[in-house]
Amino acid sequence: MKYRHPLRDILNRTRSHWDQDHTPSAARWAFGKALQCQTAELGAEVYVGDDGELIVYHTCKSRACPSCGYRANMQWLRERWAALADGSYKGITFTMPDVLWPIFRDNPHLARALPALAASVIQGEASARYGSRVGVMAILHTFNGQLEFNSHVHTMVSGGALSAHSGTWTTRINYNREQLMMAWRRAVIELLRAALRVGVLQANPTAADEMEALLAKQEARWWSIKIQSFKSREHFLRYAGRYVRRPPIAQHRITFIGERSVRFWRKDKKQRRRVYVTCSLEEFIDRWAQHVPERYQHTVRSFGLFAPRPLSQTSDAIFVLLGQKQRLRPKPRPWAVSLKRDFGRDPLLDSTGKRMRWIGRLPPNTYRHTNQ
């Protein structure tokens, strides 16, 4: 069965559950805003044409809203596409043993440090092997196909590097998987040990000796590191864009919403087929809530040559070294332009093809009857 707004429907049905103190404040705020999206609660713009008035309600811009997330994601893709030079890129995914996932779930302040750790590992490897600087874009990813907590970091790394001494561009940089794994494992374990020493680590087991034994055991394990080569930045950006501004589950994956349960599908990569997952509405909301980032938390972070300040200083040089013309940063598209470009329909044209004109704005919580 297809639902027009399945996530909003689930939020409406479970409001008495998630609108409580036990829900993380960021998720509670985001869920509330998502329910107000495109309603009189947020106000509206009023347009008039030969057919009458058109009321266009404001959007919420919440990270839990699939509609707003799509538009924000497309704008992010356009900006990143313009800022990065053409060429090859590498995608490196840093994972960790599943026994460490609950620790980072219960300590989000430590999870926020993982992108910087991953970037430092990559930069250290490039500096040690080539004496060069690379650009790194890191995205903290906290969920799997079942919406369970699974902390890992996706990174996009420039395929080439800028020599720290000669200022020349090295066209190809290769990484040793084992060296990256050992450096990543060491960095994560040291982060947890440092947090344990200063008393900012909340985890089960809580005893310091038990935690140290757990970390020592993970220090002897092999941690999975995945390295991919992308022919262009577009390949990675489209892949990463799914996790940047959108909710952790696409709406088309939800196949059934009942009075007490919800069913959705996930991909089984080993068997190459869809697997259906059924859980209660409350459990679905709880899983979703743990993946909503803090309101002012950056989901994408840039380091090295991609960091904001170095990028402004070295971007011109990189484009010149690669013989490419630098592109201007694209301006945000108005909502009507976005709809026309993405769906082929101009919402501000009336039935006669004439353009409607703006006549005013409705403040929040104002209801107004419209003929359309």
Question: What are the roles of these predicted feature ranges?
Answer:
Residues 1-372:
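Beta->alpha loop/short-helix hinge microenvironment recognizer with preference
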